[in-house]
């Protein structure tokens, strides 16, 4: 990475409203991710820009930038998608996933599964957001067709929530549907 690329990336970190201290926290991990993935650090769509968008969506503090880059790296290198695909999908699905109680790592993993099926970028984000929204609506309103579909499969809303009232992990949601359909 060049000094100009680092400066450009830090400009995007600043434009996102980060303080000097937050920019310091985020520069190293984001630059390392950019270097490892061979992507630009600065500029629109650079790693710094994508990271600030993702961290803002999940309200992740700058001190956790290394964890964020680890999660992004793991998702991108274990699925058929680029960092740009992942960030674009998170733009579409992140708010719904966060509201449903799923963190960045869980969201990235779900997007990775879709990426492996050739559903990438905004298409993956839209599909995931719709799935979560429809699942939540089906579980919340007994008058909806989705609720009837769940009960016809022998499933109830309680099957999809943990003891604290949060939606269970997506792999468990998929498993419940898979078992019900067999």
Positions of PLM-derived features:
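Soluble extramembrane regions of membrane proteins in the secretory/endomembrane system
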Residues: 164-165, 169-172, 176
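Extended, hydrophobic alpha-helical segments in both membrane/secreted and soluble proteins
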Residues: 106-110
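Conserved catalytic-loop aspartate of Hanks-type protein kinases
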Residues: 128
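A short, structural motif
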Residues: 1-67, 74-86, 97-105, 117-125, ...
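Amphipathic alpha-helical coiled-coil/leucine-zipper-like oligomerization segments
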Residues: 30, 72, 174-177
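Active-site substrate-binding loop specific to GH73 endo-beta-N-acetylglucosaminidase modules
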Residues: 147-152
């Amino acid at each position: 990475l060049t000094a100009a690329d680092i400066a450009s990336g830090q400009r995007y970190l600043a434009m996102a409203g980060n303080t000097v201290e937050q920019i310091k926290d985020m520069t190293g991990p984001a630059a390392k991710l950019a270097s490892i993935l061979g992507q630009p650090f600065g500029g629109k769509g650079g790693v710094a820009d994508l990271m600030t968008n993702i961290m803002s969506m999940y309200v992740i503090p700058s001190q956790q930038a290394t964890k964020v880059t680890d999660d992004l790296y793991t998702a991108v290198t274990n699925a058929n998608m680029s960092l740009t695909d992942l960030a674009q999908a998170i733009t579409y699905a992140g708010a719904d996933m966060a509201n449903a109680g799923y963190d960045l790592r869980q969201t990235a993993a779900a997007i990775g599964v879709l990426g492996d099926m050739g559903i990438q970028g905004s298409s993956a984000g839209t599909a995931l957001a719709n799935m979560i929204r429809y699942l939540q609506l089906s579980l919340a309103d007994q008058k909806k067709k989705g609720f009837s579909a769940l009960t016809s499969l022998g499933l109830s809303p309680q099957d999809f929530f943990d003891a604290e009232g949060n939606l269970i992990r997506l792999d468990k949601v998929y498993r419940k549907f898979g078992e019900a359909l067999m």
